[in-house]
Structures are given as structure tokens and as C-alpha cells.
Amino acid sequence: MGGKMLRSVSELIYKVYARYLLGQINLNNLPGHVALIVDGNRRWARKEKRDRISDGHRAGAGKAVDFLHWCDELDINIVTLYLLSNDNLKNRNRQELNDLVQVICDLIAQVSKRWKVNHVGSCENLPELLGNSLEGVKSSTKTNRYSERSMTVNLAIGYSGRAEITEAVRKIVNTYPIGDLPEKITEEVISANLYTGGLSDPDLIIRTSGEQRLSDFMPWQSTHSEFYFLEALGPDLRKVDFLRAIRDFSIRRRSFGA
């Protein structure tokens, strides 16, 4: 009985604190585009003494879905999840990569049922199963079965910021005559040819696990982004952590490089 009572009190305190944080947020200054770097899944699996690293990836994916719901509750327009980098594809062992691919495929299926989904990244080196899942997302998005107000979710899979910029420049070089290139290679043209062309840059980038770096994530688009680094590992992310990040953003005065 004592344990149940303690849990009930803890849950009540948590709910009260969450409402308090929500009340402190300036709802007139919310980010239009939030990005989440999901990090710490493997460390979480080791910390929890799980037999399989994939348990950490699956727990992190579940928390990413929670994160999307939290963003949707605040009417945030665009959310980007950094799920799989080019470096992950190159450096993870085969078994872990296979498990991770299955987790991401399940995540894609779940997310695409509720929100508009874009793939941000290259399909070139993706495992066939993952490539097919992303192709399925393209087809479902084309059916226009989502409302105009539906949140857009970008899934950064097979993503590298350096590769993205390189590919954008190549597109431009292959599109225009050599003599026109000096005038055509502008910030606006490069932005339009990125994987995220046509979408706004992230206003707020959140990273879990205590690491304070971007890890090749949107180096071009994050020029004027605000950053919020959390100590919590990906699977341990809580709604109050999210609300603190949003509260912090909502009271900042952004300089945009001025």
C-alpha cells in the first residue's frame, strides 16, 4: 500500500509540475519547426542491463512517438527526427543495424498513419527493407488523406549534412550552364536544393543524452537555430523535459546573427 501511495503522490506532483511548466510557456512565441536528435539508446540498454541493444532503440523510438504527440498538442507545424546517419550505416555491426532498421520501419508505419511524413536523406545506401518503407510513405502522402493542419514529420534517415550540401551543389552545377554558375550559386538556390527544400529551417534543436554537438545534423539549416541539450538518454525523455525546452525557447530573444 505504501508503494502505491508513493507512486500516486509522485504522479500527482509530476502532473502539477507539467501544468505549471505549460503555464510558463509564451504561446505567442512557439517554435514552428522543432528537431530532435535521438541519442543515448545504446547507453540506456546497457544501463538497464538489457540483453539486446535493440531494446534501447525500440524504447527510443517509442519515446520519439511520444515527442511527436507532445509537439502536436502545441500545434507545432514541423518536427524532424534524426534517426539514422550515414555514419551509423557504415559503422554499426550487421546485427545491430538489422535490428535498428526493423525498429525504424515499425516507427515509419506508426507515424505515417497520423502525420504527413517526409524522408530527409539519401536512399542510396539504405537497406532494401528501409528503402521500401520510405517509398510506401511517399505513396501514402500523395493520397492527401491528411488535413491541411496536419503536422509534418521529417524523418532524417541515411542523413549526412555534408553529403546533403555536396549533393545540392552538384544538382545546381548539373542544372545551369557553366557561365551562369557564379550568379546561380546563392544561399537561396542551395537551400532550395537541399533535402529539406521548401521547408522552414528548424527553430529549435533538442538533443538527448548530454552530448553537446550536432553530429553532422543540418549544418546549413541550423545557422540560426536555438539549441537545447538534455542529460536524459533518449528512452528516458519525459514530457516535462520537452516542456522545459519549449519554455526556454519561448522566452529567448533570438538575434538571428545580429
From Swiss-Prot:
Cofactors required:
Mg(2+)
Fetch the Pfam families from UniProt. Prenyltransf
Q: Which residues bind substrate?
A: 40-44, 52, 57, 85-87, 92, 207, 213-215
Where along the sequence do coiled-coil regions lie?
none
Q: Which GO terms describe its biological process?
A: polyprenol biosynthetic process
| Catalytic residue positions | 39, 88 (proton acceptor)
Positions contributing to Mg(2+) binding:
39, 226
GO MF term set:
ditrans,polycis-polyprenyl diphosphate synthase [(2E,6E)-farnesyl diphosphate specific] activity; magnesium ion binding
E.C. no: 2.5.1.-
Domain of life of the organism encoding this protein: Bacteria
Q: What are the entry keywords?
A: Magnesium, Metal-binding, Transferase
Record text on cofactor binding: Binds 2 magnesium ions per subunit.
Q: Which NCBIfam families match?
A: PRK14828.1 (NF011403), uppS (TIGR00055)
Per the similarity annotation, which family is this?
Answer: Belongs to the UPP synthase family.
PANTHER family in the record: DEHYDRODOLICHYL DIPHOSPHATE SYNTHASE COMPLEX SUBUNIT DHDDS, DEHYDRODOLICHYL DIPHOSPHATE SYNTHASE FAMILY MEMBER
Q: Tell me, how does this one assemble?
A: Homodimer.
State what this protein does. Catalyzes the condensation of isopentenyl diphosphate (IPP) with allylic pyrophosphates generating different type of terpenoids.
What name does UniProt use for this protein?
Isoprenyl transferase 2
Query: What is the originating organism of this protein?
Result: Tropheryma whipplei (strain Twist) (Whipple's bacillus)
Q: What does the organism's lineage look like at the top?
A: Bacteria, Bacillati, Actinomycetota, Actinomycetes, Micrococcales
